[in-house]
């Protein structure tokens, strides 16, 4: 039975899958990547109530100003932009979300109502990396 889905931590706060070959393999093998913690344990929204030890490396302060700029320009929340950023990737990343907050769920749905430009996408990637993209 072929592998058709791979769940991996992917977000603006966790870029490993972009550089370690994970998303490249997904594209080549036609595997759908599912992003767990796509909002960095809530840090991309209003903040996290608690982080897992592996999530203590998150540094949202690097990219939140750029994320807020794109969100303001589009008239949507940073949650919508962060998820739209994942959805724009050619590997067709599927974010795995969980929330009991109705507004966060509405914000997440907004991500499917627009598409980031290539410039916006790379602006966010550059901010998240903390250095220019080669």
Functional labels for PLM-detected ranges:
Residues 1-134:
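Beta/alpha (TIM)-barrel catalytic core signal, keyed to glycine-rich beta->alpha loops juxtaposed to Asp/Glu
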């Amino acid at each position: 039975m072929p592998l058709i889905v791979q769940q991996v931590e992917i977000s603006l706060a966790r870029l490993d899958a972009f550089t370690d070959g994970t998303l490249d393999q997904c594209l080549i093998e036609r595997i759908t990547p599912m992003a767990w913690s796509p909002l960095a344990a809530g840090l991309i929204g209003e903040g996290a109530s608690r982080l897992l030890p592996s999530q203590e490396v998150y540094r949202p302060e690097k990219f939140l100003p750029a994320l807020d700029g794109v969100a303001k320009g589009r008239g949507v929340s940073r949650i919508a932009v962060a998820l739209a950023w994942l959805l724009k990737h050619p590997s067709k990343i599927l974010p795995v979300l969980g929330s009991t907050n109705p507004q966060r769920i509405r914000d997440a749905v907004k991500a499917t109502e627009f598409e980031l430009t290539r410039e916006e996408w790379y602006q966010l990637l550059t901010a998240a990396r903390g250095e220019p993209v080669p």
